[in-house]
A protein has these predicted regions:
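N-terminal, post-signal-peptide region of Sec/Tat-exported proteins
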Residues: 39-76
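Boundary at the C-terminal end of the N-terminal hydrophobic targeting segment
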Residues: 21-23
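Bacterial N-terminal signal peptides that target proteins for export
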Residues: 1-9
Length: 178
Protein backbone atom coordinates (compact mmCIF):
# COMPACT_ATOMS: atom_id res chain seq x y z
CA UNK A 1 0.00 0.00 0.00
CA UNK A 2 2.77 2.39 0.90
CA UNK A 3 4.58 1.66 -2.35
CA UNK A 4 1.40 2.30 -4.34
CA UNK A 5 0.88 5.62 -2.55
CA UNK A 6 4.46 6.63 -3.30
CA UNK A 7 4.07 5.71 -6.99
CA UNK A 8 0.85 7.70 -7.22
CA UNK A 9 2.52 10.72 -5.62
CA UNK A 10 5.42 10.50 -8.06
CA UNK A 11 3.00 10.14 -10.99
CA UNK A 12 0.99 13.13 -9.75
CA UNK A 13 4.19 15.17 -9.40
CA UNK A 14 5.34 14.40 -12.95
CA UNK A 15 1.89 15.06 -14.39
CA UNK A 16 1.80 18.42 -12.62
CA UNK A 17 5.28 19.32 -13.86
CA UNK A 18 4.45 18.24 -17.42
CA UNK A 19 1.22 20.30 -17.29
CA UNK A 20 3.21 23.38 -16.27
CA UNK A 21 5.85 22.67 -18.92
CA UNK A 22 3.08 22.74 -21.55
CA UNK A 23 1.36 25.70 -19.92
CA UNK A 24 2.62 28.48 -22.07
CA UNK A 25 -0.06 31.09 -21.48
CA UNK A 26 -2.05 32.63 -18.67
CA UNK A 27 -5.66 33.38 -19.58
CA UNK A 28 -7.49 35.87 -17.34
CA UNK A 29 -11.24 35.69 -18.03
CA UNK A 30 -13.33 38.83 -17.65
CA UNK A 31 -16.73 37.17 -17.91
CA UNK A 32 -18.84 35.71 -15.09
CA UNK A 33 -16.04 33.27 -14.24
CA UNK A 34 -13.86 36.12 -12.95
CA UNK A 35 -13.89 36.40 -9.17
CA UNK A 36 -12.39 39.90 -9.02
CA UNK A 37 -12.72 42.02 -12.15
CA UNK A 38 -11.10 45.16 -10.76
CA UNK A 39 -8.06 43.31 -9.45
CA UNK A 40 -7.79 41.62 -12.86
CA UNK A 41 -7.26 45.03 -14.46
CA UNK A 42 -4.61 45.71 -11.84
CA UNK A 43 -2.89 42.44 -12.73
CA UNK A 44 -2.82 43.42 -16.41
CA UNK A 45 -1.16 46.69 -15.38
CA UNK A 46 1.30 44.82 -13.12
CA UNK A 47 2.24 42.46 -15.97
CA UNK A 48 2.89 45.41 -18.30
CA UNK A 49 4.94 47.13 -15.60
CA UNK A 50 7.13 44.00 -15.54
CA UNK A 51 7.87 44.42 -19.27
CA UNK A 52 5.66 41.55 -20.41
CA UNK A 53 3.19 42.06 -23.26
CA UNK A 54 -0.50 41.45 -22.60
CA UNK A 55 -3.10 40.59 -25.22
CA UNK A 56 -6.42 42.26 -24.47
CA UNK A 57 -9.08 40.11 -26.10
CA UNK A 58 -11.76 42.70 -26.85
CA UNK A 59 -15.33 41.35 -26.57
CA UNK A 60 -13.99 37.81 -26.06
CA UNK A 61 -15.37 36.46 -22.79
CA UNK A 62 -15.94 39.95 -21.44
CA UNK A 63 -12.66 41.45 -22.68
CA UNK A 64 -10.28 38.86 -21.24
CA UNK A 65 -6.49 39.12 -21.00
CA UNK A 66 -3.82 36.65 -22.08
CA UNK A 67 -0.05 36.64 -21.71
CA UNK A 68 2.93 34.29 -21.74
CA UNK A 69 3.14 32.09 -18.67
CA UNK A 70 5.60 33.00 -15.95
CA UNK A 71 5.52 31.64 -12.38
CA UNK A 72 5.65 35.19 -10.97
CA UNK A 73 2.44 36.07 -12.82
CA UNK A 74 0.69 32.99 -11.49
CA UNK A 75 1.83 33.85 -7.96
CA UNK A 76 0.55 37.42 -8.25
CA UNK A 77 -2.81 36.20 -9.56
CA UNK A 78 -3.16 33.89 -6.56
CA UNK A 79 -2.11 36.60 -4.08
CA UNK A 80 -4.64 39.09 -5.48
CA UNK A 81 -7.45 36.55 -5.73
CA UNK A 82 -7.90 36.86 -9.50
CA UNK A 83 -9.37 33.95 -11.47
CA UNK A 84 -7.16 32.58 -14.22
CA UNK A 85 -6.49 29.54 -16.37
CA UNK A 86 -3.18 28.08 -17.45
CA UNK A 87 -3.50 27.17 -21.13
CA UNK A 88 -1.27 25.59 -23.76
CA UNK A 89 0.06 27.15 -26.95
CA UNK A 90 -2.59 25.22 -28.88
CA UNK A 91 -5.41 26.65 -26.74
CA UNK A 92 -3.99 30.19 -27.07
CA UNK A 93 -3.71 29.80 -30.85
CA UNK A 94 -7.29 28.53 -30.99
CA UNK A 95 -8.48 31.64 -29.12
CA UNK A 96 -6.48 33.91 -31.44
CA UNK A 97 -7.92 32.13 -34.50
CA UNK A 98 -11.46 32.49 -33.16
CA UNK A 99 -10.90 36.21 -32.50
CA UNK A 100 -9.55 36.73 -36.03
CA UNK A 101 -12.69 35.33 -37.65
CA UNK A 102 -14.71 37.97 -39.52
CA UNK A 103 -17.87 36.19 -38.32
CA UNK A 104 -17.44 37.55 -34.78
CA UNK A 105 -17.11 41.00 -33.25
CA UNK A 106 -13.84 40.29 -31.41
CA UNK A 107 -10.43 41.88 -31.67
CA UNK A 108 -7.00 41.44 -30.14
CA UNK A 109 -5.22 44.51 -28.82
CA UNK A 110 -1.57 43.96 -27.95
CA UNK A 111 -0.61 46.02 -24.90
CA UNK A 112 3.11 46.70 -24.69
CA UNK A 113 3.54 49.61 -22.28
CA UNK A 114 1.90 50.54 -19.00
CA UNK A 115 0.40 54.04 -18.98
CA UNK A 116 1.36 56.75 -16.52
CA UNK A 117 -2.02 57.78 -15.13
CA UNK A 118 -3.23 61.02 -13.56
CA UNK A 119 -6.64 61.85 -12.13
CA UNK A 120 -7.78 65.47 -12.13
CA UNK A 121 -9.29 65.92 -8.68
CA UNK A 122 -8.71 68.23 -5.70
CA UNK A 123 -5.78 67.20 -3.49
CA UNK A 124 -8.00 67.29 -0.40
CA UNK A 125 -10.09 64.34 -1.59
CA UNK A 126 -9.47 60.86 -0.20
CA UNK A 127 -9.51 57.86 -2.59
CA UNK A 128 -12.96 56.84 -1.30
CA UNK A 129 -14.37 60.32 -2.12
CA UNK A 130 -13.92 59.74 -5.84
CA UNK A 131 -15.12 56.66 -7.76
CA UNK A 132 -12.16 56.66 -10.16
CA UNK A 133 -9.48 56.92 -7.49
CA UNK A 134 -11.35 54.35 -5.40
CA UNK A 135 -11.31 51.85 -8.28
CA UNK A 136 -7.68 52.52 -9.21
CA UNK A 137 -6.60 52.18 -5.57
CA UNK A 138 -8.52 48.92 -5.12
CA UNK A 139 -7.16 47.54 -8.42
CA UNK A 140 -3.63 48.47 -7.29
CA UNK A 141 -3.07 50.61 -10.37
CA UNK A 142 -0.75 53.52 -9.53
CA UNK A 143 -1.84 57.04 -10.39
CA UNK A 144 -1.04 60.64 -9.55
CA UNK A 145 -3.58 63.19 -8.40
CA UNK A 146 -3.23 66.47 -10.25
CA UNK A 147 -5.23 69.64 -10.07
CA UNK A 148 -5.02 73.21 -11.35
CA UNK A 149 -1.49 73.92 -10.06
CA UNK A 150 0.05 70.98 -11.95
CA UNK A 151 -1.78 71.88 -15.13
CA UNK A 152 -0.60 75.50 -14.89
CA UNK A 153 2.98 74.25 -14.34
CA UNK A 154 2.74 72.28 -17.60
CA UNK A 155 2.83 68.78 -16.05
CA UNK A 156 0.31 67.20 -18.45
CA UNK A 157 2.94 65.83 -20.89
CA UNK A 158 4.21 63.57 -18.08
CA UNK A 159 1.08 61.43 -18.39
CA UNK A 160 -0.22 58.96 -20.94
CA UNK A 161 -3.74 58.97 -19.53
CA UNK A 162 -5.55 61.79 -17.77
CA UNK A 163 -8.95 61.13 -16.25
CA UNK A 164 -11.14 64.23 -16.05
CA UNK A 165 -14.51 64.35 -14.34
CA UNK A 166 -17.07 65.97 -16.61
CA UNK A 167 -18.58 67.98 -13.74
CA UNK A 168 -15.27 69.81 -13.31
CA UNK A 169 -15.87 71.54 -16.65
CA UNK A 170 -19.65 71.90 -16.72
CA UNK A 171 -20.17 73.95 -13.58
CA UNK A 172 -21.61 70.92 -11.80
CA UNK A 173 -18.62 70.35 -9.51
CA UNK A 174 -19.73 70.43 -5.90
CA UNK A 175 -23.48 70.49 -6.70
CA UNK A 176 -23.80 67.07 -5.06
CA UNK A 177 -22.76 68.55 -1.72
CA UNK A 178 -24.66 71.69 -2.22
Amino acid sequence: MRELTMRLLILFFFLTISKLACANYVFIPMDAKQSNHLKAYGIAYWILKNDIEVDWLLNYRGGSFMCKYQPAIQNELVVRGVSFEIISDAQANSIITEIASPAVNYDLMKLEKYPKIAVYTPKSKQPWDDAVTLVLTYAEIPYDVIFDDEIMKGDLPKYDWLHLHHEAFTGQYGKFYG
